[in-house]
């Protein structure tokens, strides 16, 4: 069965990648794209409906699955629209507040909603194995993280870095809000044991690099994930759209559910 897909922000870097891969996927059909005025040039060649808002498309495409890598406020707005029309929604947006996440969860009770701060299969496998690594190493090892992204990225730290940090904190039974350190400067004293340093680098056109450090007596372990192209995230989002089309509302689905 072919899955109809609507792509939000189709004129952007991520949107362009997703639309191209949806069109090349034999199990999907590009039903429509959404982009604001002034960024729609070239979208008419896609052979689908082009609109300025999601609400223009959903009434005529109730079975379509929407893929959204836009911005937190826009994604929440789109989740509300999908909930009204019963359309599935795959979200790759990062930077949500706790209140916005709660609203997405509410929408997921009315229509299928899938959210992952990173659509890469590799990152999500990393989230599975990190707790075991941290537990086996024991309390003697300090935990640190560095994330690197392109100079256009708006949120810091990345959503992936925060999820990785949550994973580390959960393995140690710590509260991330209490132990996270995003900035070190000046005479700050010795490093507390219950701390996870999260450092950010921005520059160039780097798609995404995340490195977790476990630093112990006489040795250091580094676990790095590098995304070489946006196609990694687009492929994960398309896979999620196909999976979501077969599922019902009831919870905010994540990569753990799909994998």
Curated annotation (Swiss-Prot):
**UniProt-annotated location(s):** Cytoplasm
Q: Where are the transmembrane segments?
A: none
Q: Per the record, what is one GO cellular component? A: cytoplasm
Name the UniProt key words of this record, in alphabetical order: Amino-acid biosynthesis, Cytoplasm, Diaminopimelate biosynthesis, Lysine biosynthesis, NAD, NADP, Oxidoreductase
| Catalyses which reaction(s) | (S)-2,3,4,5-tetrahydrodipicolinate + NAD(+) + H2O = (2S,4S)-4-hydroxy-2,3,4,5-tetrahydrodipicolinate + NADH + H(+); (S)-2,3,4,5-tetrahydrodipicolinate + NADP(+) + H2O = (2S,4S)-4-hydroxy-2,3,4,5-tetrahydrodipicolinate + NADPH + H(+)
Sequence positions that bind NADP(+): 36
Q: Which residues bind (S)-2,3,4,5-tetrahydrodipicolinate?
A: 150, 159-160
Q: Which GO terms describe its biological process?
A: diaminopimelate biosynthetic process; lysine biosynthetic process via diaminopimelate
Which segment of the chain is annotated as a signal peptide?
none
Query: Which terms does the record give in the GO molecular function aspect?
Result: 4-hydroxy-tetrahydrodipicolinate reductase; NAD binding; NADP binding; oxidoreductase activity, acting on CH or CH2 groups, NAD or NADP as acceptor
Q: List the disulfide bonds.
A: none
- Active site residues according to the UniProt entry: 149 (proton donor/acceptor), 153 (proton donor)
Enzyme class, broadest EC rank = oxidoreductase
* InterPro entries given in the database record: DapB_C, DapB_N, DHDPR_bac, NAD(P)-bd_dom_sf
Query: What protein name applies here?
Result: 4-hydroxy-tetrahydrodipicolinate reductase
Say which species the protein is native to: Oleidesulfovibrio alaskensis (strain ATCC BAA-1058 / DSM 17464 / G20) (Desulfovibrio alaskensis)
